[in-house]
Amino acid sequence: MTGVAAPERIARAVRADIRALTAYPVADAAGCIKLDAMECPYELPAEVRDDIARAARETPLNRYPAAANPALQAQVRQAFEVPAQAGLLFGNGSDELIHLIIQACCEPGDTVLSPWPSFVYFDMAARLSHARFVGVPLTAGLELDLPATLAAIEAHQPKVVFLALPNNPTGDLWPDAAVRAILDAAPGLVVLDEAYQPFAGHTWMPRIMDEPNAVVMRTVSKIGLAGLRFGYLAGHPAWIAEFDKVRPPYNMDVLSQAVLAAVLRHKPVLDAQADRLRADRQPLADGLAALPGVTVFPSAGNFVLARFCGKLDGNAVHLAPKTRKILVRNFSNAHPLLADCLRISVGTPTENAAVLSALQDILSA
């Protein structure tokens, strides 16, 4: 076998479905205005960074993380209003938590279901675990198709249903009555993904202990800590105990825990940043809607989805901001329902004005 080339060895060793995948694309952002990843555009104030530096200096790196961090759990409960009776599990962002949920719940061939299009990692994580992913198409207006979703639940009996509240990339926040109908119909677990909850002003967290088949999943990525990779899952302690069984040992490094603890002592700073982005979302949406041939979809997130139906399609329009080193996310080829759609994160007022100017110039040329 020593003379066998690497590609042949890979074909023998790596799963065929993995070889067929492409790695998650991350654009080169050097020197660019980043409006493509729903990050907070504001850096933390100096006093917060000083506390982070102090916490890092005082954190020993020669020992593995403790199995639990009761002090940080207490901080997270207080900062994010997690019910005292709920179980709480930390993960490296929502991505790891999605993996843990599917690994714990699904045997090969079991079904994971979500309205679609939604967060792409629901699909990817299911496939990586040999589960079957069922995406229930949204309506032509990118709203939840509740009858179709309930019919799919009845037909496929999913072990796990993922609901992004609000949804990414559409921005739609589905009504409580629709979520309630899905909770009542689902035979397994319903994961309420509240990654963008700080911008929606709505949450299921206070009610999570009343829902025997639901958990709330969140991340700190969208509120100014995307570089930290920290997510948390809250729900009935019995659910959390099962997911904890498949959690890798020492999954949360000590620096991430120390940094989060330091930042949460300044929680009003994060809240103010979220409030600012929520306030700036509507002017960005209004500016996009004023452009010729543009349809803007309502958003409860820190981003706006717009469809470009004029003389230029979404692929062509996408190039205009890029030539000015402004990154936005092109969904034109991601799903038929997203044809000619760009998703634009809410940035600073200056950044929002820059992307609107670039789009105005190309659409008016």
From Swiss-Prot:
Q: List the disulfide bonds.
A: none
Q: Which domain of life is it from?
A: Bacteria
Q: Which cofactor does it need?
A: pyridoxal 5'-phosphate
Q: Which UniProt keywords apply?
A: Amino-acid biosynthesis, Aminotransferase, Histidine biosynthesis, Pyridoxal phosphate, Transferase
A Gene Ontology biological process term: L-histidine biosynthetic process
EC number(s)? 2.6.1.9
InterPro entries assigned to the protein according to its UniProt record, in alphabetical order:
Aminotransferase_I/II_large, HisP_aminotrans, PyrdxlP-dep_Trfase, PyrdxlP-dep_Trfase_major, PyrdxlP-dep_Trfase_small
The signal peptide here is none
Q: How does it assemble?
A: Homodimer.
Quote the PANTHER family the UniProt record gives: HISTIDINOL-PHOSPHATE AMINOTRANSFERASE, HISTIDINOL-PHOSPHATE AMINOTRANSFERASE-RELATED
Entry protein name: Histidinol-phosphate aminotransferase 2
Q: Which gene encodes it?
A: hisC2
